[in-house]
Amino acid sequence: MIGRLRGSLAEKQPPHLVLDVNGVGYELEVPMTTLYRLPHVGETVTLHTHLVVREDAHLLYGFYEKRERELFRELIRLNGVGPKLALALMSGLEVDELVRCVQAQDTSALTRIPGVGKKTAERLLVELKDRFKAWESLPGTFTLVSNGPNQAEPVASAESDAVSALISLGYKPQEASKAVSAIKEKDLSSADLIRRALKGMG
């Protein structure tokens, strides 16, 4: 099991990235909450990882905080929740927001996530309630702030990456394109475009 990787961020194409560890490139898929915190390409970063082994592939998922990885592991233990839906949930809600949502048994926040209807949201909240009791006493919160100005990206490339990332989360291509196009601010990175688009669709 690969539990943690430290290396140079070689590529960043949401929601995927490549981490160069001593000359070996590890391809990882990350939630948007991790993407927002990543440094510039070429800089060093440490990610906590979870490996999913399938017959046809070995899939590696990366998380900026260990607590995010633990949440991911809790989510994929639930009936009907695979890595894709778990990443979508974590991309649409911060960890502490999801914990508060479970505490309050609030279905409205979950149903904004692609692929989560009312019945699914109700079932997830019931199943997560007991699992999250231990989380209430854990210190620390997640504040989604970037480590600094994002490296400049060509506008067309940033918008294309943002749309692709939203589609990978389960949004329809038209929804994703419309949400990104609706953002009026100029010269934003793909991470900032994704963040604003998700807020706009929430």
Curated annotation (Swiss-Prot):
**UniProt region (Domain I), positions on chain:** 1-64
Return the Pfam families for the record.
Answer: HHH_5, RuvA_C, RuvA_N
What disulfide bonds does the UniProt entry report for this chain? Answer: none
Task: Report which superkingdom the organism of origin falls in.
Answer: Bacteria
Under the heading SMART domains, the entry gives: HhH1
Q: Name one GO molecular function term.
A: four-way junction helicase activity
What information about domains appears in the record's comments? Has three domains with a flexible linker between the domains II and III and assumes an 'L' shape. Domain III is highly mobile and contacts RuvB.
Function, as annotated, reads: The RuvA-RuvB-RuvC complex processes Holliday junction (HJ) DNA during genetic recombination and DNA repair, while the RuvA-RuvB complex plays an important role in the rescue of blocked DNA replication forks via replication fork reversal (RFR). RuvA specifically binds to HJ cruciform DNA, conferring on it an open structure. The RuvB hexamer acts as an ATP-dependent pump, pulling dsDNA into and through the RuvAB complex. HJ branch migration allows RuvC to scan DNA until it finds its consensus sequence, where it cleaves and resolves the cruciform DNA.
How does the annotation summarize its subunit structure?
Homotetramer. Forms an RuvA(8)-RuvB(12)-Holliday junction (HJ) complex. HJ DNA is sandwiched between 2 RuvA tetramers; dsDNA enters through RuvA and exits via RuvB. An RuvB hexamer assembles on each DNA strand where it exits the tetramer. Each RuvB hexamer is contacted by two RuvA subunits (via domain III) on 2 adjacent RuvB subunits; this complex drives branch migration. In the full resolvosome a probable DNA-RuvA(4)-RuvB(12)-RuvC(2) complex forms which resolves the HJ.
Q: What family does the Swiss-Prot or TrEMBL record give for this protein?
A: Belongs to the RuvA family.
Q: What is this protein called?
A: Holliday junction branch migration complex subunit RuvA
Q: What is the lineage of its organism?
A: Bacteria, Pseudomonadati, Pseudomonadota, Gammaproteobacteria, Pseudomonadales
Q: What gene is behind this protein?
A: ruvA
